[in-house]
Amino acid sequence: MTQGKLSVANKAPGTEGQQQANGEKKETPAVPSAPPSYEEATSGEGLKAGAFPPAPSAVPLHPSWAYVDPNSSSSYESGFPTGDHEFFTTFSWDDQKVRRVFIRKVYTILLIQLLVTLGVVALFTFCDPVKDYVQANPGWYWASYAVFFATYLTLACCSGPRRHFPWNLILLTIFTLSMAYLTGMLSSYYNTTSVLLCLSITALVCLSVTVFSFQTKFDFTSCQGVLFVLLMTLFFSGLILAILLPFQYVPWLHAVYAVLGAGVFTLFLAFDTQLLMGSRRHSLSPEEYIFGALNIYLDIIYIFTFFLQLFGTNRE
């Protein structure tokens, strides 16, 4: 009887398997042996093979597509996922080549847009016959505004035309020409010195904000709520200004509105710049180069127009 009561540790390696195969059931000891320590369980020293199950592997036993490395995914920055957005992505920005190509493409398109707009502004500012014509025919202004609004809604809200060549470039070209006409006509009402001054200030501000956005560790993409509140403040201030300004109730309200608008769109420029970078709470998909160029272009144009309202001097 004594010999029949073997401890679990003294069993032969094949004994338990033979008992299970024969359908026999053997009583376990009344007092089980103490479990091994962590070092014993992981090292395997002092234990017979088969006494305890093997230690789990270090890699999770999930399929590779179900595992997301938080260090390689921009959507896991700040400790929580960002959700599924149409414009945003969980694309890994570790591939520096893809990132550089995307940013280069956005800024190439942006440079062409700004050069076209600068040419139209210069034409409407320095060429007196053109300036007189556009001021005498305001219908072209409203037609350009309608084209601008329609193309902007199409590019901003419809991912199909925005992502497919050549429709995205055609729509962006029409959008840029209409916005350039609006900006040029607005500039024609100011003297040349004011326009050049505002162009210089806009260039310095935009360059400084862009460099700062690339260098700083502060995440502007996590401040969407603050930017939305500021944008709504700017919107309702514009409505109040449109009502009060014709009656000259508050003469300085226009300057306050211009300062607020320039500040809000400067923050939006930092926000849209960091969307291109990755390594932030939100980032644009590499397919959204048209959307990225569109946003930054609008930010720069709005900053310029608000500076014109703030520093510009009307033509006599």
Curated annotation (Swiss-Prot):
GO MF annotation list: calcium channel activity
Protein localization: Cell membrane; Membrane raft; Postsynaptic cell membrane
One BP term from GO: cerebellar Purkinje cell layer development
Alphabetical keyword list: Apoptosis, Cell membrane, Glycoprotein, Membrane, Postsynaptic cell membrane, Synapse, Transmembrane, Transmembrane helix
Keyword Nucleotide-binding: no
Glycan-modified residues: N191
Pfam annotation, one family: Bax1-I
Keyword Transmembrane helix recorded: yes
Segments for region (Disordered): 1-46
GO terms for cellular component: endoplasmic reticulum; Golgi apparatus; membrane; membrane raft; postsynaptic membrane
Membrane topology: Multi-pass membrane protein
Transmembrane annotation, as ranges: 106-126, 138-158, 165-185, 194-214, 225-245, 251-271, 290-310
Function: Antiapoptotic protein which protects cells uniquely from Fas-induced apoptosis. Regulates Fas-mediated apoptosis in neurons by interfering with caspase-8 activation. Plays a role in cerebellar development by affecting cerebellar size, internal granular layer (IGL) thickness, and Purkinje cell (PC) development.
Quaternary context: Interacts with FAS/TNFRSF6 and BAX.
Family the entry assigns: Belongs to the BI1 family. LFG subfamily.
Name assigned to this protein: Protein lifeguard 2
Species annotation: Bos taurus
